[in-house]
């Protein structure tokens, strides 16, 4: 049954959904990597599609920017449409000098300056972590594809234009691999509602050096991340 934000029916979505922030990137992923694609959501322009990858039913849908937006969509997908696994596929900014542009980062955990998980966890700290099997499958898929993926913590920021530049020093000290805006929220939602989640990011810019990838480069390097996500789903089916 349709929700306020998703005009689909039970069965329209696969049990696994890849989720970029940008709905147009969701469309690109569906058209580039999936077969027999059909649109399953267009409310508020947040496009969602379902198709097959190597015969496996998979969905892809945008989640917007920030924890509030992605929390709405992931919650509804899990509780109203039977989704069991969510893989966020997005971009992140690097803060460590040993993390380079175009590196693929697998988010084993996610720190955050948001209070959303403390709200749902009775004002206590919640360890926002990815599902172990999904992490392992993504690592194995990356190796099989010849992609040297980094594995570690992300930082999910509430502010894109943050006034706190000193926080980047703290992130670097604690070994944070990349800064983005959603992983901690998605991991919290998955934990609350009994689903599994993973975030895979491509480093699109470096906060320290101010380097950035071009639009053309992002198209190519982001595809490596999508292939890892898709192949990891197939590996998960073999368990």
Swiss-Prot record:
Choose any GO biological process term that the UniProt entry carries and state it: purine nucleoside catabolic process
* Species in which this protein is naturally found: Salmonella paratyphi B (strain ATCC BAA-1250 / SPB7)
Which is an annotated GO molecular function term of this record? Answer: purine-nucleoside phosphorylase activity
Q: Where does the record place the site Important for catalytic activity?
A: 218
Provide the function of this protein.
Catalyzes the reversible phosphorolytic breakdown of the N-glycosidic bond in the beta-(deoxy)ribonucleoside molecules, with the formation of the corresponding free purine bases and pentose-1-phosphate.
Reaction(s) the record says it catalyses: a purine D-ribonucleoside + phosphate = a purine nucleobase + alpha-D-ribose 1-phosphate; a purine 2'-deoxy-D-ribonucleoside + phosphate = a purine nucleobase + 2-deoxy-alpha-D-ribose 1-phosphate
Sites binding a purine D-ribonucleoside sit at: 5, 180-182, 204-205
Binding of phosphate, residues: 21, 25, 44, 88-91
The gene name on file is deoD
HAMAP family xref list: Pur_nucleosid_phosp
What protein name is recorded for this chain?
A: Purine nucleoside phosphorylase DeoD-type
């Amino acid at each position: 049954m349709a929700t306020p934000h998703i005009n689909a029916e039970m069965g329209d979505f696969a049990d696994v959904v890849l989720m970029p922030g940008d709905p147009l990137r969701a469309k690109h992923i569906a058209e580039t990597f999936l077969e027999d694609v059909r649109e399953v959501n267009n409310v508020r322009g947040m496009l969602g599609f379902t198709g097959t990858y190597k015969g496996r039913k998979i969905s892809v849908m945008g989640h917007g920017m920030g924890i509030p937006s992605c929390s709405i969509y992931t919650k509804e997908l899990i509780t109203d449409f039977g989704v069991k696994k969510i893989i966020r596929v997005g971009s992140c900014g690097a803060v460590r000098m040993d993390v380079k542009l175009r590196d693929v980062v697998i988010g084993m955990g996610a720190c955050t300056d948001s209070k959303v998980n403390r709200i749902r966890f009775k004002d206590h700290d919640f360890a926002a972590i990815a599902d172990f099997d999904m992490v392992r499958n993504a690592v194995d898929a990356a190796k099989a594809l010849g992609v040297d993926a980094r594995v570690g913590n992300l930082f999910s920021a509430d502010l894109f234009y943050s006034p706190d530049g000193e926080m980047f020093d703290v992130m670097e000290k604690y070994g944070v691999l990349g800064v983005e805006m959603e992983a901690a929220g998605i991991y919290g939602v998955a934990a609350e509602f009994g689903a599994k989640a993973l975030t895979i990011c491509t480093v699109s810019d470096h906060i320290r050096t101010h380097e950035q990838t071009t639009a053309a480069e992002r198209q190519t390097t982001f595809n490596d991340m999508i292939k890892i996500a898709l192949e990891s789903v197939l590996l998960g089916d073999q368990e």
